[in-house]
UniProtKB/Swiss-Prot annotation:
Known tissue expression: Highly expressed in heart, lung, liver and kidney. Low levels in spleen, skeletal muscle and testis. No expression in the brain.
Regulation: During activation, the N-terminal disordered prodomain is removed by cleavage. Concomitantly, double cleavage gives rise to a large Caspase-7 subunit p20 and a small Caspase-7 subunit p11. The two large and two small subunits then assemble to form the active CASP7 complex. Can be cleaved and activated by different caspases, depending on the context. Cleaved and activated by initiator caspases (CASP8 and/or CASP9), leading to execution phase of apoptosis. Cleavage and maturation by GZMB regulates granzyme-mediated programmed cell death. Cleavage and maturation by CASP1 regulates pyroptosis.
Region of interest: Loop L4: 274-288
Spans annotated as Loop L3: 226-238
Bias-annotated ranges (Basic and acidic residues): 10-26
Family label: Belongs to the peptidase C14A family.
Protein name, as recorded: Caspase-7
Designated gene of the protein: Casp7
Enzyme Commission no: 3.4.22.60
Domain notes: The exosite polybasic region mediates non-specific RNA-binding, acting as a bridge for RNA-binding target proteins, such as PARP1. The exosite is also required for interaction with non-RNA-binding proteins, such as Hsp90 co-chaperone PTGES3.
Organism in which the protein naturally occurs: Mus musculus (Mouse)
PTM (free text): Cleavage by different proteases, such as granzyme B (GZMB), caspase-1 (CASP1), caspase-8 (CASP8) or caspase-9 (CASP9) generate the two active subunits. Its involvement in different programmed cell death processes is probably specified by the protease that activates CASP7. Cleaved and activated by initiator caspases (CASP8 and/or CASP9), leading to execution phase of apoptosis. Cleavage and maturation by GZMB regulates granzyme-mediated programmed cell death. Cleaved and activated by CASP1 in response to bacterial infection. Propeptide domains can also be cleaved efficiently by CASP3.
Keyword vocabulary terms for this entry: Acetylation, Allosteric enzyme, Apoptosis, Cytoplasm, Hydrolase, Nucleus, Phosphoprotein, Protease, RNA-binding, Secreted, Thiol protease, Ubl conjugation, Zymogen
Loop L2: region residues: 187-196
Catalytic activity: Strict requirement for an Asp residue at position P1 and has a preferred cleavage sequence of Asp-Glu-Val-Asp-|-
Length: 303
Protein backbone atom coordinates (compact mmCIF):
# COMPACT_ATOMS: atom_id res chain seq x y z
CA UNK A 1 0.00 0.00 0.00
CA UNK A 2 1.33 3.42 -0.90
CA UNK A 3 -0.14 6.80 -1.71
CA UNK A 4 -3.84 6.76 -0.85
CA UNK A 5 -5.72 8.02 2.16
CA UNK A 6 -6.66 4.49 3.24
CA UNK A 7 -3.12 3.97 4.50
CA UNK A 8 -3.84 6.08 7.56
CA UNK A 9 -6.49 3.66 8.80
CA UNK A 10 -4.39 0.61 7.99
CA UNK A 11 -1.39 2.01 9.83
CA UNK A 12 -3.43 2.52 12.99
CA UNK A 13 -3.37 -1.26 13.55
CA UNK A 14 -0.83 -1.78 16.34
CA UNK A 15 0.55 -4.78 18.18
CA UNK A 16 -0.82 -5.56 21.62
CA UNK A 17 2.59 -6.34 23.08
CA UNK A 18 4.08 -3.81 25.49
CA UNK A 19 7.73 -4.86 25.15
CA UNK A 20 10.22 -2.33 23.82
CA UNK A 21 12.55 -3.18 20.98
CA UNK A 22 15.57 -1.60 19.34
CA UNK A 23 16.12 -0.95 15.64
CA UNK A 24 19.40 -2.84 15.35
CA UNK A 25 20.63 -6.26 14.29
CA UNK A 26 19.76 -8.72 17.10
CA UNK A 27 22.55 -9.63 19.54
CA UNK A 28 22.45 -13.42 19.34
CA UNK A 29 24.69 -13.79 22.44
CA UNK A 30 22.02 -12.52 24.83
CA UNK A 31 18.28 -11.95 24.93
CA UNK A 32 16.69 -8.69 25.95
CA UNK A 33 13.79 -9.71 28.15
CA UNK A 34 10.89 -7.95 29.83
CA UNK A 35 11.76 -4.46 28.65
CA UNK A 36 8.86 -2.17 29.46
CA UNK A 37 8.33 1.44 28.69
CA UNK A 38 8.07 3.78 31.70
CA UNK A 39 6.82 7.17 30.54
CA UNK A 40 6.82 10.04 33.03
CA UNK A 41 3.61 12.08 33.06
CA UNK A 42 4.76 15.40 34.44
CA UNK A 43 5.19 17.19 31.10
CA UNK A 44 5.03 20.94 31.53
CA UNK A 45 2.64 23.05 29.45
CA UNK A 46 3.95 26.58 29.62
CA UNK A 47 3.29 29.45 27.25
CA UNK A 48 4.86 29.38 23.82
CA UNK A 49 7.76 31.78 23.38
CA UNK A 50 9.61 31.88 20.12
CA UNK A 51 12.40 33.94 21.66
CA UNK A 52 13.14 35.77 18.43
CA UNK A 53 11.65 38.05 15.84
CA UNK A 54 11.15 36.72 12.33
CA UNK A 55 13.47 38.62 10.02
CA UNK A 56 12.47 37.92 6.38
CA UNK A 57 16.08 37.87 5.19
CA UNK A 58 16.77 34.87 7.41
CA UNK A 59 13.56 32.94 6.72
CA UNK A 60 12.90 30.26 4.13
CA UNK A 61 10.15 31.31 1.75
CA UNK A 62 6.95 29.40 2.42
CA UNK A 63 4.60 31.33 0.12
CA UNK A 64 4.56 28.61 -2.53
CA UNK A 65 1.49 26.91 -3.95
CA UNK A 66 2.23 23.74 -1.97
CA UNK A 67 4.06 22.85 1.23
CA UNK A 68 5.68 19.92 -0.53
CA UNK A 69 5.93 16.15 -0.50
CA UNK A 70 6.59 13.92 2.50
CA UNK A 71 7.67 10.35 1.77
CA UNK A 72 7.45 7.86 4.64
CA UNK A 73 9.36 4.60 4.18
CA UNK A 74 8.05 2.14 6.77
CA UNK A 75 10.05 -1.09 6.94
CA UNK A 76 8.54 -3.63 9.33
CA UNK A 77 9.31 -7.07 7.89
CA UNK A 78 12.72 -8.24 6.70
CA UNK A 79 14.04 -11.17 4.71
CA UNK A 80 15.33 -14.00 6.88
CA UNK A 81 18.81 -13.68 5.37
CA UNK A 82 19.23 -10.21 6.92
CA UNK A 83 18.89 -11.57 10.46
CA UNK A 84 16.61 -8.66 11.35
CA UNK A 85 13.54 -9.02 13.57
CA UNK A 86 10.05 -7.72 12.82
CA UNK A 87 9.74 -4.06 13.89
CA UNK A 88 6.49 -4.30 15.83
CA UNK A 89 5.10 -0.86 16.57
CA UNK A 90 6.39 0.82 13.42
CA UNK A 91 2.88 0.96 11.91
CA UNK A 92 1.88 3.09 14.88
CA UNK A 93 4.75 5.46 14.02
CA UNK A 94 3.83 5.58 10.34
CA UNK A 95 0.17 6.28 11.07
CA UNK A 96 0.98 9.08 13.50
CA UNK A 97 3.49 10.63 11.11
CA UNK A 98 1.05 10.43 8.20
CA UNK A 99 -1.52 12.49 10.12
CA UNK A 100 1.07 14.86 11.57
CA UNK A 101 2.69 15.86 8.27
CA UNK A 102 -0.66 15.97 6.51
CA UNK A 103 -1.85 18.47 9.13
CA UNK A 104 1.21 20.60 8.37
CA UNK A 105 0.14 20.76 4.72
CA UNK A 106 2.38 18.09 3.19
CA UNK A 107 1.29 15.65 0.50
CA UNK A 108 2.12 12.42 2.33
CA UNK A 109 2.71 8.95 0.90
CA UNK A 110 3.65 5.79 2.81
CA UNK A 111 5.66 2.92 1.35
CA UNK A 112 5.87 -0.32 3.32
CA UNK A 113 8.60 -2.99 3.44
CA UNK A 114 10.83 -1.53 0.74
CA UNK A 115 13.92 -3.26 -0.60
CA UNK A 116 17.14 -1.27 -0.86
CA UNK A 117 16.58 -0.89 -4.60
CA UNK A 118 12.99 0.25 -4.02
CA UNK A 119 14.11 2.92 -1.52
CA UNK A 120 16.68 4.18 -4.00
CA UNK A 121 14.13 4.20 -6.81
CA UNK A 122 11.49 6.03 -4.75
CA UNK A 123 13.82 8.83 -3.73
CA UNK A 124 15.53 9.10 -7.10
CA UNK A 125 12.15 9.51 -8.82
CA UNK A 126 11.04 12.02 -6.18
CA UNK A 127 14.19 14.08 -6.77
CA UNK A 128 13.48 14.13 -10.51
CA UNK A 129 9.99 15.59 -10.05
CA UNK A 130 9.29 19.29 -10.48
CA UNK A 131 9.22 20.93 -7.03
CA UNK A 132 9.03 24.48 -8.37
CA UNK A 133 5.69 25.10 -6.66
CA UNK A 134 6.72 23.48 -3.37
CA UNK A 135 8.23 25.14 -0.31
CA UNK A 136 10.22 22.13 0.89
CA UNK A 137 10.61 18.34 0.92
CA UNK A 138 10.46 15.82 3.78
CA UNK A 139 11.33 12.15 4.09
CA UNK A 140 10.95 9.81 7.06
CA UNK A 141 12.89 6.54 7.26
CA UNK A 142 11.56 3.95 9.73
CA UNK A 143 13.73 0.84 9.81
CA UNK A 144 16.56 -1.05 11.45
CA UNK A 145 19.92 0.63 11.13
CA UNK A 146 23.59 0.87 11.94
CA UNK A 147 25.88 3.89 11.90
CA UNK A 148 25.36 5.68 8.55
CA UNK A 149 23.33 2.72 7.24
CA UNK A 150 19.62 1.95 6.90
CA UNK A 151 18.02 -1.45 6.24
CA UNK A 152 15.76 -2.27 3.35
CA UNK A 153 13.79 -5.49 3.67
CA UNK A 154 16.57 -7.34 1.81
CA UNK A 155 19.74 -5.74 3.11
CA UNK A 156 21.48 -2.52 4.03
CA UNK A 157 22.27 0.69 2.14
CA UNK A 158 24.14 3.90 3.05
CA UNK A 159 21.83 6.71 4.14
CA UNK A 160 23.92 9.16 2.14
CA UNK A 161 23.15 7.28 -1.08
CA UNK A 162 19.45 7.93 -0.46
CA UNK A 163 19.74 11.59 0.45
CA UNK A 164 22.30 12.48 -2.24
CA UNK A 165 19.56 12.50 -4.89
CA UNK A 166 18.41 15.84 -3.44
CA UNK A 167 21.76 17.65 -3.57
CA UNK A 168 21.64 21.08 -5.11
CA UNK A 169 23.38 19.92 -8.28
CA UNK A 170 20.96 17.02 -8.79
CA UNK A 171 17.57 18.40 -7.74
CA UNK A 172 17.49 21.93 -9.10
CA UNK A 173 13.84 22.66 -8.22
CA UNK A 174 14.64 22.21 -4.51
CA UNK A 175 17.72 24.44 -4.65
CA UNK A 176 17.78 26.81 -1.64
CA UNK A 177 14.73 25.04 -0.19
CA UNK A 178 14.79 22.91 2.98
CA UNK A 179 15.17 19.16 2.55
CA UNK A 180 14.25 17.39 5.79
CA UNK A 181 15.11 13.79 6.70
CA UNK A 182 13.82 12.16 9.89
CA UNK A 183 15.47 8.83 10.66
CA UNK A 184 14.16 6.34 13.23
CA UNK A 185 16.79 3.61 13.39
CA UNK A 186 19.61 2.39 15.60
CA UNK A 187 23.07 3.81 14.97
CA UNK A 188 25.03 1.23 16.96
CA UNK A 189 24.76 -1.05 20.00
CA UNK A 190 25.76 1.19 22.89
CA UNK A 191 23.31 1.77 25.75
CA UNK A 192 22.88 5.08 27.58
CA UNK A 193 22.84 4.61 31.38
CA UNK A 194 21.88 8.23 32.01
CA UNK A 195 23.12 10.29 34.96
CA UNK A 196 21.33 11.87 37.89
CA UNK A 197 20.96 15.60 37.40
CA UNK A 198 21.95 17.63 40.43
CA UNK A 199 36.99 31.59 20.16
CA UNK A 200 37.71 34.76 18.08
CA UNK A 201 36.14 35.68 14.73
CA UNK A 202 37.37 34.01 11.58
CA UNK A 203 38.36 36.18 8.64
CA UNK A 204 36.49 34.83 5.64
CA UNK A 205 36.69 35.91 2.04
CA UNK A 206 33.42 37.50 0.97
CA UNK A 207 31.76 36.03 -2.10
CA UNK A 208 29.12 37.25 -4.46
CA UNK A 209 25.85 35.92 -2.94
CA UNK A 210 24.53 35.15 -6.44
CA UNK A 211 27.59 33.10 -7.33
CA UNK A 212 27.32 29.55 -5.98
CA UNK A 213 25.40 27.55 -3.37
CA UNK A 214 27.07 24.53 -1.71
CA UNK A 215 25.47 21.35 -3.05
CA UNK A 216 25.03 20.00 0.50
CA UNK A 217 23.30 23.15 1.77
CA UNK A 218 19.72 23.29 3.06
CA UNK A 219 19.59 19.74 4.41
CA UNK A 220 18.40 18.79 7.90
CA UNK A 221 18.88 15.33 9.40
CA UNK A 222 16.93 14.51 12.56
CA UNK A 223 18.13 11.19 13.98
CA UNK A 224 16.33 9.27 16.71
CA UNK A 225 19.60 8.74 18.58
CA UNK A 226 23.25 9.79 18.63
CA UNK A 227 25.98 7.89 16.73
CA UNK A 228 26.80 4.49 18.20
CA UNK A 229 23.64 4.01 20.26
CA UNK A 230 20.46 1.97 20.28
CA UNK A 231 17.11 3.56 19.45
CA UNK A 232 14.13 2.37 21.48
CA UNK A 233 10.70 1.40 20.16
CA UNK A 234 7.55 0.24 21.98
CA UNK A 235 5.33 -2.18 19.99
CA UNK A 236 2.13 -0.75 21.44
CA UNK A 237 2.95 2.95 21.34
CA UNK A 238 5.65 3.32 18.72
CA UNK A 239 9.22 4.57 18.99
CA UNK A 240 10.17 7.11 21.65
CA UNK A 241 11.49 9.53 19.03
CA UNK A 242 8.42 9.46 16.79
CA UNK A 243 6.07 9.74 19.77
CA UNK A 244 7.89 12.88 20.88
CA UNK A 245 8.28 14.31 17.37
CA UNK A 246 4.59 13.96 16.53
CA UNK A 247 3.55 15.35 19.91
CA UNK A 248 5.67 18.49 19.54
CA UNK A 249 4.74 18.99 15.87
CA UNK A 250 1.05 18.66 16.71
CA UNK A 251 1.42 21.18 19.55
CA UNK A 252 3.80 23.71 18.01
CA UNK A 253 4.43 22.75 14.38
CA UNK A 254 3.00 26.00 13.05
CA UNK A 255 4.40 28.47 15.57
CA UNK A 256 7.94 27.31 16.44
CA UNK A 257 11.04 27.25 14.24
CA UNK A 258 12.26 23.76 13.25
CA UNK A 259 15.34 23.84 15.52
CA UNK A 260 13.17 24.90 18.45
CA UNK A 261 10.83 22.02 17.65
CA UNK A 262 13.65 19.48 17.54
CA UNK A 263 15.20 20.85 20.73
CA UNK A 264 11.89 20.21 22.49
CA UNK A 265 11.83 16.73 20.98
CA UNK A 266 15.29 16.13 22.44
CA UNK A 267 14.11 17.27 25.85
CA UNK A 268 10.98 15.13 25.80
CA UNK A 269 12.80 11.95 24.79
CA UNK A 270 15.58 12.59 27.30
CA UNK A 271 13.33 13.31 30.27
CA UNK A 272 10.09 11.43 29.72
CA UNK A 273 11.20 8.01 28.50
CA UNK A 274 13.17 5.26 30.24
CA UNK A 275 13.44 1.50 29.79
CA UNK A 276 12.86 -1.02 32.58
CA UNK A 277 14.07 -4.60 32.49
CA UNK A 278 14.73 -7.58 34.76
CA UNK A 279 18.13 -7.74 33.09
CA UNK A 280 20.26 -5.01 34.76
CA UNK A 281 22.18 -4.47 31.52
CA UNK A 282 19.03 -3.08 29.92
CA UNK A 283 17.32 -1.53 32.92
CA UNK A 284 16.62 2.22 33.18
CA UNK A 285 18.28 3.08 29.88
CA UNK A 286 17.89 6.46 28.23
CA UNK A 287 18.01 7.94 24.73
CA UNK A 288 18.79 11.33 23.22
CA UNK A 289 17.98 12.26 19.61
CA UNK A 290 20.47 14.09 17.42
CA UNK A 291 20.05 16.75 14.74
CA UNK A 292 22.51 17.70 12.03
CA UNK A 293 21.61 20.92 10.24
CA UNK A 294 22.92 22.41 7.04
CA UNK A 295 19.95 24.76 6.85
CA UNK A 296 20.86 28.31 5.88
CA UNK A 297 17.73 30.04 7.14
CA UNK A 298 15.05 29.63 9.76
CA UNK A 299 12.17 27.32 8.89
CA UNK A 300 8.57 27.83 10.03
CA UNK A 301 5.83 25.59 8.65
CA UNK A 302 3.27 28.40 8.86
CA UNK A 303 2.41 29.89 5.44
Amino acid sequence: MTDDQDCAAELEKVDSSSEDGVDAKPDRSSIISSILLKKKRNASAGPVRTGRDRVPTYLYRMDFQKMGKCIIINNKNFDKATGMDVRNGTDKDAGALFKCFQNLGFEVTVHNDCSCAKMQDLLRKASEEDHSNSACFACVLLSHGEEDLIYGKDGVTPIKDLTAHFRGDRCKTLLEKPKLFFIQACRGTELDDGIQADSGPINDIDANPRNKIPVEADFLFAYSTVPGYYSWRNPGKGSWFVQALCSILNEHGKDLEIMQILTRVNDRVARHFESQSDDPRFNEKKQIPCMVSMLTKELYFSR
